[in-house]
Amino acid sequence: MLPAYDVIVVGGGHAGCEAAAAAANMGANTLLITMDMTKFAQMSCNPAMGGIAKGQIVREIDALGGYSAIVTDKSMIQFRMLNRSKGPAMWSPRAQCDRTIFTTEWRKVLEQIEKLDLWQDLVTELIIQEGTVKGVKTKFGVQFNAKTVILTNGTFINGMMYVGRKKVEGGRAGEAPSKGISEQLEKFGFEVGRMKTGTPARLDGRTIDFSKLQEQKGDDEGGQFSFLTHDHKPRNDKSCYITYTHPDVHSVLETGFKESPLYTGIIEGIGPRYCPSIEDKIVTFADKDKHQLFLEPEGFETNEYYINGFSSSLPLNVQLKALKLIPGLENVKIYRPGYAIEYDYYPPTQLNHTLETKYIRNLYFAGQINGTTGYEEAGAQGLMAGINSVLKIREEPAFILNRDQAYIGVLIDDLITKGVDEPYRMFTSRAEYRILLRQDNADIRLTELGHRLGLVPQHRFDLLKDKIRYRDELIEFIKTYSVSPPEINPFLQKAGSSPLKQKRKLMDIVLRPEVSINKIKEHVLPLKQLIEKIPNRNEEIVESAEVLIKYSGYIEREQQVADKLKRLEHKIGRAHV
């Protein structure tokens, strides 16, 4: 006799893994069904996590008790903090990961969660009675009953892959599509659309001439995504490489347009604007003589490289001929060609802010089936769907993040209220309150909420309280401690900053743009001693304190705007009651 579950999650990608983990950790008996248990949270496209705004999302998932950041740190091969030259609202962590280790670590996580069962199979039908989902049926003829179901099917629903005029059914190279669900949902009034994404060829690193490429190393000091302290610092010892296309490459690519599924009308789905194929780029930006390409390593124990910026669905011979004209790739061999994939999605205006559907009760959607693109966006939706499915079962208030609380709140609000007409990707520009939604304070914004939900254990909540206490002590010291001209002027002159003529509070010095706490501590012994007393994460705590000191005026002003808007929304809401 098969058990009945509280929550069934369909699909083991980034959304599905976070959804299943959240539901089970909140105490719900949960089943995760996936077609291939060796590919949990598979990095189907580039082997990287984070990036502009996306890195903030990963840190928010971590702050709420999800696992994407922890798994990223364990599989990391390179770390970079993007946009360091800009203000802290724009800083975004990004990591290259070992694709195989990433999947393996996710499986370890899932197998250690007590109330989570795993099942390898393909869901072909939802069990729906009187407008409420009651479970699922699988290809093996198994029926699982549940109180709630979360669909996280990614690109697999009626997936079709293209290389030139050749087309193959599938949701990913070598994997079958999921069929039957869209047809069933259409009968219940759901609108179904088609979207397109793509991936580039994978290169054999043994055939790349790296001497002709520009090396791009990770940050000297490294870094991590999770707010937890790890036993070992994440690795940061693999480089990426940069090269460029040129007009001859573009000419070769153009010879394949007559065979391109994009230009022959075979593919009707809309592709991601911010991750266009190489054929899209040379048409849209015909005035550009070159396009930048990044060669990203797939892992520690492989020669495979991902060529970021060269996504294509052109015929294989055209792809290969064009690749061989790129500097450094004259003798390149490939492991497989690039391809486009077209798949079903459901316009997310058919959902509530909890990610529960409006047409079928207790059914939730998360990830690319909502019209988003990216591992990070998918993971965030999965986490929120997992949380809200459990709260629905308990008949407790829904968990909805506001736009001034998290990028996750911006993401879901955009999807539900605006919908999508192309694959949705998060950017810092989408957030009105990005000074509040920084990557450094995701734990301060969200970890207490995760603790209340039961996702963040007490020891982790204690870490947050320690961080806030040490940060506030550091800020108070800087506000009250005075420095004399003889003590600090040698440092100021070296830093190109105006010397003091009389004693000043340390705060006045730290506020100068050319001065940082880490630099000045070497010249102010009591400050250095205070920082050295901070156990473990002192770099993170110093950064948090410095951001608050330097940007306090901007932060306070933005918080006032957010609070004012909330009051207006409350008044409007009451007026409509």
Where are these regions (language model features)?
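Short hydrophobic core segments
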Residues: V10, Q143-G154
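A glycine-rich dinucleotide-binding beta-alpha-beta segment and adjacent secondary-structure elements
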Residues: Y306-T372, I400-D413, N538-R574
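Conserved beta-strand-loop-beta-strand element in the redox core of flavoprotein oxidoreductases
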Residues: I127-Q143
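Internal hydrophobic alpha-helix adjacent to the cofactor/substrate pocket in enzyme cavities
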Residues: A378-F399
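Extended, charge-enriched "interface" segments that sit outside catalytic cores
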Residues: R430, L436, T447-R452, V456-R574
